[in-house]
Every structure is written in structure tokens, then in C-alpha cells.
Amino acid sequence: MSGFSLESEFYCCKCGTKGIPIARKKGKAREAGHLKKLYCLKCGKETNHAECKEFTHYSKADFDFEREYGNFDENQNRILDYGLFRDKMHNKGVDLP
């Protein structure tokens, strides 16, 4: 099945709005949580969007958690790797998704 593709959802790291989903060929798929520059219709400019895939280690709930607790800087880049960020929040007693 060389034409098999997987669809990912993307969410703007600045405003949290769902962007346009992208289908990738299985061999070209990125890891869940990957950041990609896409145009955000709400922000009106190109921003980093987090790639979310349900039933993986990085879903929409993980994105919401990371955004709510401030793991993106003013340029929508991650401050800490998501695994390190989860560990830090767990050590602070924050409920994880």
C-alpha cells in the first residue's frame, strides 16, 4: 500500500485554533507533537502549529495541557521537550492528561 496516508490535525500554538488537517504518506509521517509553520486563519499570520494524532503519545489533550501551562514561548516554540515538561509538571503535582 504505497499510497496509504495518515491524516494529522494541527493546532495553532499561539491561539489554540484548529488548523487545516494534512494527510501525509505513511513513510513521510512526522512524530506526533511535531511543530510546523502554517498560516493561522484566526491570527492572520504564519505561526507554529502542533501536530496532534489521537491514540498516540501526543493528542489534542496533550497540546491543550502544554499550552495551558505555558510550554510555548512568544514565537510558539517549545521551551522544554514535551517529555521533560510533563515530568516537571508531574513533580509540581499538576494532574497530567
Regions found by a protein language model. Give the residues of each.
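Short, low-complexity N-terminal segments with a bias toward positive charge
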Residues: 9, 20-22
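Short linker/helix segments within small regulatory modules
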Residues: 25-37
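Secretory-pathway extracellular proteins and peptide precursors enriched for disulfide-bonded cysteines
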Residues: 4, 32, 40-41
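Short cysteine-rich clusters marking metal-coordination/redox-active sites
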Residues: 12-15, 40-43
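Short, intrinsically disordered terminal segments enriched in charged and Pro/Gly residues
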Residues: 1-9, 27-29, 50-97
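Cys/His-rich microdomains that often coordinate metals
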Residues: 19, 47
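Short, charge-rich amphipathic interface segments used for partner binding and complex assembly
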Residues: 42-45, 51
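Short acidic-hydrophobic surface loop/beta-edge motif
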Residues: 8-10, 36-38
